[in-house]
Each structure stands twice: as C-alpha cells, then as structure tokens.
C-alpha cells in the first residue's frame, strides 16, 4: 500500500513553518493555523508636489504607461522584507475629467485602460509600441499585444471609462444670459481586481522602481480616444486623472 504524502500546506506542521517565516521577516507572530494577512501598500495617482507647486492630477493622452507594483524593501507592512513578492489584489479609485483644451471640444470621450504583466522587464518602463501593435495610435480599442512579444506581455485586465464635454471648462460658473447644458464631464472609476497573482523577483537594491525588477512588472496603460474629424483633429485630447491605489501582496522565499 502506497502511503500518501502529507501536505504541509494544510497540516499543523505547515502552519508552524509559515508562522516562523512570518515572525522572522516581520518580528510579529500570528496564530498557528491561520493564514498570514496580506500586506497593503497605498499610493496616489498624482504628480508629486515641489517646493513651488502642489501635487496635481496626471495627464492621459493618446498613450500613457505607469508601473503599478512599486514596492520598496524594508520591514514595514507596506514593504517587502525578501526578494520575491506575490501581488494578489489591487484597487483603483480615481476621478477623471477633460483637460482645459479638451474641454473646449463638444462631444463624447473615452479612456481605454489595460493592466499589463511584463514577464521580462529590461530595467526601463517600455513604450506602448513595445507592448501593442499600434496601427491606429488615436484609438486604443484597436490595439492588440504585439505578436512578437506575446510571451513577454499579458493583458491581465481591460476596461474603459466614458465622459462628455459641452465645450465649457469643467466647473465654469453660469454666465449671465448664457445657458450651459449639464454634461457628465467629471466621472469616477472604482475598480477592484482579484486573482492577479503577479509574482515579482526583485534585485538586491534599496528601492522598488522598474530598474529593481528582475521578473514580473505590472503596468497601467491608458489611452484617451482622439477625435477622428472636425476642428478637434488638431487638438491633442487629454484626460486628467487623480486618485489612489492599494496593492494587496505577500512576500515569498528566503531572505
């Protein structure tokens, strides 16, 4: 009779091992028999403040890309204590509205979004043309992952956000004798992504930027759909975005 091998992941011994690893990395114990809670890292989608200007919204043009899974080393609950992390969940809570020039255009607008996994980052954030075949740069809905890079880039999630513009700047007061039609020109986007399972291997460095990632980067790609005809063809349609993100992750492996 073949004896079944004991699965340490579901045994008391396995729980004890996980408890020891958790205490060694964080200095805190958790009850044996319970899973270690996910760590949480929060950051804002905004331009950083300087000595002369406050923080502000970021701009989404016909093609914008940001790294999402930035986690610096350390012993805090929002840091990585080892060289491998697993990102399980991510929230995205932002507000979007047309830029000042874009608000002068009358019509509907759309922002296309992608969460893209990069299996083999090169130390710099790639261009959108490295990820997608961009036959029509103005219209993100036509983009597909480049055939030559399908083994490197994987689209984890894809979605869109719509808003409108009446030709009047956002928040403009009513002028005497002029009527402005109310439109949905300030919109919210609230997303919660589960089962991402983005495994990242980090270099032995002191930061958590793209240059520190050996394997497994995650990017937020965005495209404001441009106008196909009319006066707006000469205008670079821009969407402003501001908000926050939370990463829910665990550290894995040895010190």
Curated annotation (Swiss-Prot):
Gene Ontology CC entries for this record: host cell; host cell nucleus; T=1 icosahedral viral capsid
UniProt keyword list: Capsid protein, DNA-binding, Host nucleus, T=1 icosahedral capsid protein, Viral penetration into host nucleus, Virion, Virus entry into host cell
Motif segment (Bipartite nuclear localization signal): 1-25
Pfam family, one: Gemini_coat
GO biological process, one term: viral penetration into host nucleus
Subcellular location: Virion; Host nucleus
Superkingdom of the source species: Viruses
GO molecular function: DNA binding; structural molecule activity
Function of the protein: Encapsidates the viral genome into characteristic twinned ('geminate') particles. Binds the genomic viral ssDNA and shuttles it into and out of the cell nucleus. Plays a role in protection of the genome from degradation, virus acquisition and transmission by insect vectors, infectivity, and systemic movement. The CP of monopartite geminiviruses is absolutely essential for virus movement.
Family to which this protein belongs: Belongs to the geminiviridae capsid protein family.
Subunit annotation: Homomultimer. Interacts with the movement protein. Binds to single-stranded and double-stranded viral DNA.
Protein name: Capsid protein
Organism: Miscanthus streak virus (isolate 91) (MiSV)
Taxonomic placement: Viruses, Monodnaviria, Shotokuvirae, Cressdnaviricota, Repensiviricetes
